[in-house]
Amino acid sequence: MFVDQVKISLKAGDGGNGITAYRREKYVPFGGPAGGDGGKGASVVFEVDEGSRTLLDFRYQRHFKASKGENGQSSNMHGKNAEDLVLKVPPGTIIKNVETDEVLADLVEDGQRAVVAKGGRGGRGNSRFATPRNPAPDFSEKGEPGEELDVSLELKLLADVGLVGFPSVGKSTLLSIVSKAKPKIGAYHFTTIKPNLGVVSAPDQRSFVMADLPGLIEGASDGVGLGHQFLRHVERTKVIVHMIDMSGSEGREPIEDYKVINQELAAYEQRLEDRPQIVVANKMDLPESQDNLILFKEEIGEDVPVIPVSTITRDNIDQLLYAIADKLEEYKDVDFTVEEEESVGINRVLYKHTPSQDKFTILRDDDGAYVVSGNAIERMFKMTDFNSDPAVRRFARQMRSMGIDDALRERGCKNGDIVRILGGEFEFVE
C-alpha cells in the first residue's frame, strides 16, 4: 500500500460587507434605513470523485482561496452568495488539520462531501439595526472572514501494476514516460529507494496505477537490501511487470536475472509465483539485445509471452500498455490484496470541530498591555468598521455585554491602560 500525502492551504471566502444606506424616494419623507446585507462567502468543500486516482493535482497547486460574497446594496438588496469551491479527491482520502492533527474528514464513497473551511457570514446592513430608540442607525457590519487553515491530504492506494527487476533495468524510466510521475533516475544502482507511483493511461484510455518498486537483489526474500519491505509492496499488486535488461550490459545474463527474481518472489510468498506476470525485454536498442532475446525465449519457452521494448527510443511502449490493460481486465474480479491488521474494525466517520463561541482569555504583554482573545470577540472585531464611530460604540457595548470589561477590572485594568485585540489597540475607559 502506498501513501500519497500533500499539504495544502485553504482560505474560505469572506462574507460581503453590509452597507449603510437610506431610502431616498420622492414624496417619502423619513424613508429610513435601506442598507442590504452582504452575501455569504464561499466554503471550501471536498468531494469524492471515483474517477480520480491520486493527489497529483494538489502537488501543482497548494493554495486554494474561495470567493468573497458580494457586498450589500441600497434599497435593502442583499449581496449574492458566493459559490462554494469544490475540490475533487479520490476515494479513501483522509483530511487532517495540520496544526492539531485532527481528522476532519474520511472520504470513501463517490459523491461524498465534507465542508472543511466554512465561508464567512455576510455583514448586516444598517436596516438590521433599526430599533424604536434608533430608527435610522448609521452603521453596518463588515463581512465575517472565512475560515483559514492548513490541511494534509492522505491517500492510501493499492497499485494495480508493480514493476520488478534488478536495479538499473529501466523501471523508473518506463514509469516516467508512461505517466506524469517523476521518479529519480540515475546511472547507478538503487537510484530508486522508495516506491514511486504513477497513473498510466493506455492509448485506448484504459487507466491503471503503476508502481516503480526499488530494485530487487538476490537474497531479498531473506531481507537483504530491505527486501522484505519491497516484496511486501509486490504482494499487493494485481499484475507484475518483470523488466529485464536484455543487453546484459550490467554483466549479468538475462535468463539468470529472470530466474533469480522469480525465485525471490516465490520464496517470499508462494502465491506470488502464480501472480499474473508480463515479461518486458528492455534495452532492445542495444546491438547485443536481439541475440540475447532469441536465446532467452528458447530458454523460458513459448508459454511465457515476452514484450521487447526500448525505454530510450520508446519502441513498443504502446503494445506493452495494451498488454497490461488486457491482463488487468482479465483479472479484474480477482482480489489479491492483503488486509492491513490495523484497518480491521475501523469505522469511517466524519469529524467536525466546533470551537466554543463565547469564551475569552485575558493575558498580559511584556509592556503591561492586556491582550484579549477568543473566537467570539475576535469575530466581532473583524466584522466591525472602526472608521464608523457608531460601529465603534456598538463594539464597546458588545464587549460589556460579554463581560470583558468586568473581567479586565478583575485583572487590575485601570482607566487609561492599553487593551489589545488582534491587531487593534484600545484605551480602557471607566
Swiss-Prot record:
Which GO molecular function entries does the Swiss-Prot or TrEMBL record give?
GTP binding; GTPase activity; magnesium ion binding
Which InterPro entries did the record assign?
G_OBG, GTP-bd, GTP-bd_Obg/CgtA, GTP-bd_prot_GTP1/OBG_C_sf, GTP1-OBG_CS, GTP1_OBG_dom, GTP1_OBG_dom_sf, OBG_GTPase
**Location of the OBG-type G domain:** 159-329
One of the GO BP terms on file: ribosome biogenesis
Question: Which keywords fit this entry according to its UniProt record?
Answer: Cytoplasm, GTP-binding, Hydrolase, Magnesium, Metal-binding, Nucleotide-binding
Q: Does the keyword GTP-binding apply?
A: yes
Tell me where it mainly resides: cytoplasm
Q: Which stretches of sequence are listed as region Disordered?
A: 118-145
Q: Which residues bind GTP?
A: 165-172, 190-194, 212-215, 282-285, 310-312
Q: Which cofactor does it need?
A: Mg(2+)
Record-listed Mg(2+) binding positions: S172, T192
What's a GO cellular component annotated to this UniProt protein?
Answer: cytoplasm
Domain annotation Obg: ranges: 1-158
Q: Which family does it belong to?
A: Belongs to the TRAFAC class OBG-HflX-like GTPase superfamily. OBG GTPase family.
Please give the function described in this protein's UniProt entry: An essential GTPase which binds GTP, GDP and possibly (p)ppGpp with moderate affinity, with high nucleotide exchange rates and a fairly low GTP hydrolysis rate. Plays a role in control of the cell cycle, stress response, ribosome biogenesis and in those bacteria that undergo differentiation, in morphogenesis control.
Q: Which PANTHER family match?
A: DEVELOPMENTALLY REGULATED GTP-BINDING PROTEIN-RELATED, MITOCHONDRIAL RIBOSOME-ASSOCIATED GTPASE 2
* NCBIfam families listed in its UniProt record: Obg_CgtA, Obg_CgtA_exten, PRK12296.1, PRK12297.1, PRK12299.1
Q: What is this protein called?
A: GTPase Obg
**Origin species:** Staphylococcus aureus (strain bovine RF122 / ET3-1)
